[in-house]
Every structure is written in C-alpha cells, then in structure tokens.
C-alpha cells in the first residue's frame, strides 16, 4: 500500500497484475485507438510498427525495443499483454514485426535486430517453460487474442477436466522459431557465433512442427487443423470448429536461399547432421533436400499436400473467402453451427459476420465471422513465401470450384485487392465505400478519409467495432504493391 495509509487486504495478492510490480510505464506508446482503446497491447503494437515503419521507421524500431526493456518485460521473460491484464497471453508476433520493420528500413540496422533478438530469447524461453505443460511441444496459450473464436473462453480452464491443446498456440510457436531462426541467420552473416543459436531454432522448429502433425491437431478427414481437448486419461477430442485457428499453421513457413548453406558452414554442417541422424523428423524437413525455385529450400509445418487441402477450404466463398478478405470463421457454420457438450456445459459456435451475439470478452469483439486485418496480412505474407519456393507451376483454384487456376502469388495479390477494396469507392454501389455500407451517418461523398475500423463484416465489408482502430488496420498500407515481405532468408 501507500506510505502512511492502511495496508490493503491480503486478497490483493490474488488479483490481476499483482506480479507486475516492476512495471514503470512512462513512455510515448502507439495506442490501438485513442478513443475506445486508449491503452497499449503488445500484439497490436507489433502490427502498428509494421505500418508505422513506412513513414517513421525510427519510431517503429523504438516501440519494438521499448516493450523488451526491463521496465516493461517481466523478469521471467514475459511481455506485458495489455494494461488491464499484463499477465495474459498474446500471440508471439514481436519477432516477426522486428524482421518486417528491419526489412522495410532497408535491412541495414543490425544493431536494432540484435537488441530485440537478445531479449526475445528470454521471451521464447518463457513460452516454452510456461505454455508447454506436458513438455511435448504442443502448446496451450489461452485465448491468444482471438477472444470468442472457440466454443468456450480459452483464457480459462476447459469446462471438462484436461487440457486444451491448441492448433494456433502450437503454430504460433513454430512461427516464432522460424522468426528467431531468420534473425539469427541474418546476424550470423556478420557474426558467426550466431550460427549456434540458428541451429537451436532450426531443431526446435522441427520438434514443434513434428508434434503439430503427429499429435492429433491435424484432421485427415476434414483436411484441416483443429484444437483438441485432451482429458486426464489421454483421450483426445477434436473441436471441429473451422476457424482461423486452423489457418494459422500456414504462418510457419520460411525459405532458405540457395547460397545460405555455403555462406554459413557451421549451421549447414549441424543441419545436415540433424537431418541424417533424426529420421523420425523426415516428414517435417523433407523439403530441405528438395530445392525449389532458384535452389530455395522450404521449412514449414504444412507440406504441399496439406497446403492444397487447406487452401481448398480457405479459398471457398462458402467458407472463408469473402469479397473483402478472409473470414475469421467458416461461413459453413451459418447453416451448420458447431454444437457439443463439454464437461456438462452445452457449447455452440455460429457464424456471426457482424457484432458478437455472445457476451464473451464484453461482446464488443468478434472472431466468429468478421474479417480482421492482422491475420489476413500474415496469410498473404505466408502465401508469398510459399510462392518463392514453388514458383509458377504450383497452382490452386481461385475461388474454389471456379476452374480458374492461380499461383500462390496471384492468390496473395487477390486477397490484398479484396482487403484494399474495403476502403475504395465501389462503382457497383454508386461509389459508396464498403467500409461505410452499414450506416447512413457517412454520406457517399464523404471526403477521402475513410475510417479504419477494428474489424469488418464477413459478408459486406462494413466497418465494425472501434471506428478509429487505425493501429493494426493500418496494415493496409503494407498491402500496397511495393516492399513486399516475400524474400527468402538470405543472411
């Protein structure tokens, strides 16, 4: 308590934020929204920085470094989630954002990359020690920023005894491994000691990717990844809700360029040893032996066969693909909601393209159908990486069932176009912008200053949620046809 005042009750030690006494937040920080969300959130901030880097890369870098400083990061390595619950868990996107800002800034500020890298080693270790309860490389991160996407609040223990093994948490950690691997390889080009750390993340990625594909998260019948409820007896029950949870494994992809192994001999030697002596992981790292375009090598959770099956659903306009981007939940759940009983509690997930119909997380956020920019952006970036490996000969139907074939680069371009169209005058609607489709408060001749809403209607593209969420929806600036993040890891 305060000096000279009565001591607060002992129950304070059980309340939120009680373990964050080290915090001293007295800095200029990018806010998600100065009106509805005037507080920082670590994963929002990471996306803000990618948009900000196009106009002020110095500020973007300062923001990413700031959250890693000792007056923000917990001594155990956790990054603060957001101000009302510092100890909650958000997706680990800080490394991805640092790499993207590094790239936008011309791939020249190695000091910045090194500063962030060293602190993120602590954060990665926190994740492994705290969120992999069984030590089997399958993770349980909680709600991970996706609020009501599941049948129950993933921040809490499942209604039934056991653990929720999460497709998205495990995929995020595989992605985190690849981000830190890329950082280490970039730094190793200037300091060979980083080759040792690069090897660590190559191997750890392999362990996580193997677990992802062998411990029940992949559903062979549906061709999709799901969360799995594992009871105390070890029995697994997949929660067959087709949502962004099953698309996040696409993010775990990296391309090693053809000359990398020649330039980093220690890393190459150890990698070849691992491949030769660990045949149980061959399914995960098989494409290391199979050069793609320009001798590129592929590291990914999702191999070509599963990639094609996932994309068949993702690019289906009756499921994820809308006129204005990818929905957060398959539209198939409009006519076929997911229903089940978990621990005696009846649960249901419906397709809800607009505001949430459930009270989870206050009801003002909804991941059961709307389009959200951050994850759409990461899908697009991942497709561009796959394109670099497969080239123009590997195509999919776009949209599914149309008979029109497209390369993965063309799919990425089309998704970018659909997202940008939210803010552009629609000639088929009298010049009205889809973002304003839900309201007459904004006339058709509104000036060229559309609002960047928090999320968007899954069928119409209308802006929803916070109306000034310029932060991560500002990622639309990174979708312009310049400066794309489709490069291989070149070191």
Predicted region positions:
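Acidic, mature catalytic/reactive cores of soluble proteins
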Residues: 1-491
């Amino acid at each position: 308590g305060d000096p000279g005042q009565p001591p607060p009750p002992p129950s304070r030690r059980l309340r939120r934020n009680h373990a964050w006494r080290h915090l001293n937040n007295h800095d200029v920080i990018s806010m998600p929204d100065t009106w509805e969300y005037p507080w920082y959130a670590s994963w929002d901030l990471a996306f803000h920085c990618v948009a900000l880097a196009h106009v002020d890369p110095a500020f973007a870098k300062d923001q990413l470094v700031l959250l890693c400083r000792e007056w923000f990061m917990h001594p155990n390595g956790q990054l603060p989630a957001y101000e009302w619950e510092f100890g909650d868990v958000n997706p680990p996107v800080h490394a991805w954002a640092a790499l993207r800002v590094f790239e936008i800034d011309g791939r020249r500020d190695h000091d910045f990359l090194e500063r962030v890298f060293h602190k993120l080693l602590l954060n990665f270790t926190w994740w492994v020690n705290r969120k992999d309860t069984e030590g089997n490389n399958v993770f349980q991160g909680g709600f991970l920023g996706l609020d009501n996407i599941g049948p129950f609040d993933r921040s809490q223990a499942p209604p039934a005894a056991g653990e929720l093994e999460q497709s998205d948490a495990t995929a995020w950690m595989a992605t985190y491994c690849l981000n830190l691997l890329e950082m280490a390889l970039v730094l190793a080009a200037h300091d060979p000691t980083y080759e040792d750390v690069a090897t660590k993340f190559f191997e750890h990625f392999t362990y996580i990717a193997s677990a992802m594909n062998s411990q029940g998260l992949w559903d062979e019948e549906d061709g999709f990844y799901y969360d799995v409820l594992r009871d105390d007896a070890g029995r697994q029950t997949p929660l067959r809700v087709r949502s962004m949870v099953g698309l996040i494994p696409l993010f775990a992809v990296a391309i090693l360029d053809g000359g990398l192994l020649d330039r980093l001999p220690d890393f190459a030697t150890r990698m070849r040893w691992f491949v030769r002596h660990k045949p149980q992981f061959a399914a995960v790292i098989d494409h290391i032996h199979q050069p793609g375009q320009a001798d590129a090598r592929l590291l990914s959770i999702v191999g070509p066969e599963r990639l094609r099956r996932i994309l068949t659903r993702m690019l289906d306009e009756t499921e994820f693909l809308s006129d204005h981007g990818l929905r957060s939940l398959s539209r198939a759940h409009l006519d076929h909601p997911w229903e089940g009983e978990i621990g005696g509690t009846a649960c249901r997930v419906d397709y809800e393209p607009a505001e949430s119909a459930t009270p989870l997380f206050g009801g003002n956020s909804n991941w059961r159908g709307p389009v959200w920019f951050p994850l759409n952006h990461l899908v697009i970036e991942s497709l561009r990486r796959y394109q670099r490996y497969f080239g123009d000969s590997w195509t999919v139907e776009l949209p599914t069932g149309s008979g029109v074939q497209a390369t993965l680069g063309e799919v990425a371009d089309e998704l970018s176009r659909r997202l940008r169209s939210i803010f552009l005058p629609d000639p088929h609607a009298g010049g009205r912008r889809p973002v304003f489709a839900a309201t007459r408060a904004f006339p058709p001749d509104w000036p060229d200053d559309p609002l960047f809403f928090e999320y968007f209607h899954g069928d119409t593209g209308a802006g929803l949620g916070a109306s000034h969420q310029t932060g991560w929806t500002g990622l639309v600036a990174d979708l312009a046809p310049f400066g794309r993040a489709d490069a291989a890891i070149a070191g």
